[in-house]
From Swiss-Prot:
GO molecular function terms attached to this record: ATP binding; metal ion binding; pyruvate, water dikinase activity
Domain note: The N-terminal domain contains the ATP/Pi binding site, the central domain the pyrophosphate/phosphate carrier histidine, and the C-terminal domain the pyruvate binding site.
Keywords: ATP-binding, Kinase, Magnesium, Metal-binding, Nucleotide-binding, Transferase
Keyword Nucleotide-binding: yes
Name of protein: Phosphoenolpyruvate synthase
Annotated Mg(2+) binding sites: E738, D762
Gene: ppsA
rRNA-binding as UniProt keyword: no
Enzyme class, spelled out: transferase
Species assigned in the record: Aquifex aeolicus (strain VF5)
């Protein structure tokens, strides 16, 4: 029997579709749409019913409330806060005091009883959610505060919750909004969804977006997860785990998780007892250090996210990224989707215009001016006077263009946020209220700083920067920056491939929107120093170090702070460890206790120390490879010098003190040495994970500082020992051309490797025999020197003769567009640049190609 939906008071969720927003509200219409279309594809959605907007109006008229409400609100001055609060309270109490028409009450109870039967219980636990139905409001988020009542059990309690939802249409904020914009209070309806609760109080919950929310990058699903019911995450009171899944290889069947970050999940909301429907409890310490979801669950959610996005994109006739709420039932151990709505910020963006915020103040100077740091929202920068607010009661002090600094925000803060140049909060994550609103307003926000309200004072000038990757910084005073706006439609594409040098995986999604042909140099060093932080040999020999520490402690050879003399470390180390320790450091004192504690803290939750290194490195590489997929991404194996490796945790134990590290134990010579070989093996395993497990076969590798062809052959042999074979599954191996020997013997290197990448920085130093860090000779350092240019021209010629690819990843073409033109003249295949010089160099290359007749 077909239902006349336009008059219905109550409908099952699968009776409504997205076209029914006027009677069912956006949330319920979306649930109905998914149950009808996506449940058959395996997406699990809890069942329920909708008390329609017709029922709301019927309730108002049955209780003669329209005139009474109009009367209460007559002559309201919305600037008089006390008067507003008094009248708002009166309206809400009036609605709560109303009675349901008997037929409506009976229908609501009848549907509740049938829902209980469906779930084989006499009184099913439900979530009761309001959903405003105003179609003509320009910003429906202000139509009514969306109330949610969780763990409602029993028909009578459902009726009370529905009444509370009706009353939520008249929160003070909603009244102000409609009064200010001249909307009729009764043109805005409300529908209420009654949906089976998912027992996420015993499991986990969160949100997922089918794009990267900060950059609008389309090819990922970003999932946030926390323990318990979802309210704390939405309110920003816990920092959730974050998982990123790459869509193109996920849909080919790969385990495409390209990033996992552990959140600070110290509290959770669970079911309460008696009158207390829900309560907040602490999460046990061991659970805080675990991920809320396992890999299979992450992949399952991501696949559902893609299915939901595909459905809505098809329905709307355009790409429609989605914002989806999910929950994991801890009793059933099953995942469910509980809500989905289109993501509104990036889907409306102009795709061809890129704005790039560039900081001009030097990094050294900025470092000393950091007040607090947290999670960056967006990629902009703002400067202004800080206004620290602890309470909304102080909101009237807030001036247009100030920077809002507060503990946490909720929807009641939105009128203040709309006036802010930027937002800084103590608490909250990427999906907290402050982050969502900042994105919608297009202003930078730094959330989850921990202590901004203590560190920042009202009236002081500060700069909020979200233009430095995933970490947002708040600086003292004004930081110098510029904004470049580029219309990509106006950029002609050269024949020479234009690639990028990327070190920080956090900036990869942002830079991928620039015109490019891939990444000519992806550096591992940033990932190792910032993600991993621990020397690879300290991880591989952790158990040996622990055993050594216990031995030394038994002998009372460690002081109260944890220090021990290096010569004692040599003396007591077992054979395995002793062979790897640095020599000649007898007199040095080392804090062995701190090294072990730091390693233990960073690697907690990983099955073993080597896995920590391999996974962390693979996530960093994968993020870059995914951002530029399917274009090639050339990953240079680690090229730290011994003094740089020594700065890593535990590095002091294993790294020699060299007079000239730049010419010492670095690059290829490390990879096959008995001391370092096993550490290099972990790098190989990380690449295998990225290519074979995640499906990112656009990843290629490059050997730095390879002094002789024989060294090159030895490295390829070690790679094979660890399962990474040149040519297997299309793997290409390049060599850095940064030593004169690489160019003099280019014909021999060409028979070993698939291609060359010119490292013009070291090549210039080694050709001219100078140290560019020495101010006495630095004035002679110039990549445009005739000797350097002749070597480069010779290499390009040899590479062409042997059918090998040749590119450049050094600094020169980024700094000097005329140098890029010289490379084009020589017939180079690709030029890899720093992201901030891609566009100007591209124009210089196009100009030269036109001159040479390569480009018409």
């Amino acid at each position: 029997m077909s239902v006349d939906k336009s008059k219905a008071l109550v409908l099952w969720l699968d009776e409504v579709t997205i076209e029914d927003i006027p009677i069912a509200g956006g949330k319920n219409a979306s649930l109905g749409e998914m149950i009808r279309n996506l449940s058959p594809l395996g997406v699990k959605i809890p069942y329920g019913y909708v008390v329609t907007a017709n029922a709301y109006y019927y309730f108002l008229d049955y209780n003669n409330l329209r005139d009474k409400i109009r009367k209460i609100l007559e002559g309201l001055n919305t600037d008089d806060l006390k008067d507003l609060q008094r009248r708002g309270h009166e309206v809400r109490e009036l609605i709560r005091g109303g009675t349901f028409p008997p037929d409506l009450e009976e229908a609501i109870k009848d549907y509740y009883n049938k829902l209980s039967e469906k779930y084989k219980t006499h009184a099913v636990d439900v979530a009761v959610r309001s959903s405003a139905t105003a179609e003509d409001l320009p910003d429906a988020s202000f139509a009514g505060q969306q109330e949610t009542y969780l763990n409602v059990v029993g028909a009578e309690n459902v009726l009370v919750a529905i009444k509370n939802c009706f009353a939520s249409l008249f929160t003070d904020r909603a009244i102000v909004y409609r009064e200010r914009f001249g909307f009729d209070h009764f043109k805005v309806g409300i529908a209420v969804g009654v949906q089976k609760m998912v027992r996420s109080d015993m499991g986990a919950s969160g949100v997922m977006f089918t794009l990267d929310t900060e950059t609008g990058f389309k090819d990922v699903v970003v999932i946030n997860a926390a323990y318990g019911l979802g309210e704390l995450l939405v309110r920003g009171e816990v920092t959730p785990d974050e998982y990123i899944v790459f869509k193109p290889t996920l849909m080919k069947g790969y385990s495409a998780i390209i990033e996992k970050k552990l959140g600070r999940k110290d509290r959770k909301m669970i079911y309460g007892t008696g009158d207390e429907r829900v309560k907040i409890v602490n999460v046990p310490k061991e659970d805080q250090k675990k991920f809320a979801l396992n890999d299979d669950e992450i992949l399952q959610l991501a696949k559902w996210g893609v299915l939901i996005e595909e459905h809505y994109s098809k329905k709307n006739g355009r790409w429609t990224p989605m914002d989806i709420e999910w929950a994991k039932d801890g009793i059933l151990n099953e995942l469910f989707v509980v809500q989905a709505r289109p993501e509104t910020v990036h889907s409306r963006k102009k795709e061809n215009v890129v704005k790039i915020y560039k900081i001009k103040t030097p990094e050294e100077e900025r470092k000393n001016r950091v007040i607090v740091k947290g999670i960056a929202v967006g990629d902009k920068i703002a400067t202004g006077k800080a206004r620290v607010l602890f309470d909304l009661k102080e909101a009237d002090q807030f001036q247009e263009g100030e920077i809002l600094v507060t503990d946490i925000t909720d929807p009641d803060w939105e009128p203040v946020m709309k006036k802010a140049a930027a937002i800084v909060t103590n608490r909250g994550g990427r999906t907290s209220h402050a982050a969502i609103v900042a994105r919608e307003l297009g202003i930078p926000a730094v959330v989850g700083t921990g202590n901004a309200t203590e560190k920042i004072k009202t009236g002081e000038e500060i700069t909020v920067s979200c233009a430095e990757g995933e970490t947002g910084y708040v600086y003292e005073g004004k930081i110098d920056y510029e904004v470049e706006e580029i219309n990509l439609e106006n950029i002609p594409k050269p024949k020479t491939k234009i690639m990028m040098n990327i070190g920080n995986p956090e900036s990869a999604f942002r830079y991928a929107s620039l015109p490019n042909d891939g990444v000519g140099l992806a550096r591992e060093e940033f990932i190792i120093a910032n993600y991993i932080k621990i020397h690879p040999l300290a991880l591989l020999h952790y158990e040996d170090l622990k055993e050594l520490y216990e031995k030394l402690e038994r002998e009372n050879l460690i002081d109260e702070k944890g220090f021990v003399q290096f010569k004692l470390i040599y003396h007591y180390a077992n054979g395995r460890l002793a062979n790897k320790l640095a020599k000649g450091k007898d007199k040095l004192r080392v804090n062995l206790r701190k090294i072990l504690q730091d390693i233990e803290n960073l690697t907690f939750g990983y099955e073993d120390k080597a896995t920590y290194y391999i996974k962390k490195l693979s996530y960093g590489i994968a993020k870059i490879a995914a951002a530029f997929y399917p274009n090639p991404v050339i990953v240079r194996f680690s090229d730290f010098k011994s003094n740089e490796y020594a700065n890593l945790i535990g590095g002091i134990l294993f790294e020699p003190e060299e007079e000239n590290p730049m010419l010492g134990w670095r690059g290829a010579s490390r990879y096959y040495s008995d001391v370092f070989k096993e550490a290099f093996g972990m790098e190989c395993k990380a690449i295998i994970r990225v290519r074979n497990k995640m499906g990112l076969t656009n990843t290629k590798v490059m050997i730095p500082f390879c002094r002789t062809p024989e060294e090159g052959e030895k490295v390829l042999q070690v790679m094979e020992e660890y399962g990474l074979r040149k040519g297997e599954n299309g793997l290409e191996v390049y060599v850095m051309a940064e030593l004169p020997s690489n160019i003099v013997l280019a014909d021999r290197y060409a028979q070993i490797f698939d291609g060359f990448s010119i490292g013009s920085n070291d090549l210039t130093q080694l050709t001219l025999g100078l140290d560019r860090d020495s101010e006495l000779v630095a004035h002679l350092y110039d990549e445009r020197n005739e000797a350097v240019k002749r070597l480069i021209a010779q290499l390009i010629k040899t590479a062409k003769e042997y059918g090998r690819k040749v590119g450049i990843c050094g600094q020169a073409p980024s700094d000097f567009p005329e140098f890029a033109q010289f490379l084009v003249e020589q017939g180079i295949d690709s030029i890899s640049l720093n992201p901030d010089s891609v566009l100007k160099t591209m124009l210089a290359v196009v100009e030269m190609e036109k001159k040479l007749g390569v480009l018409k």
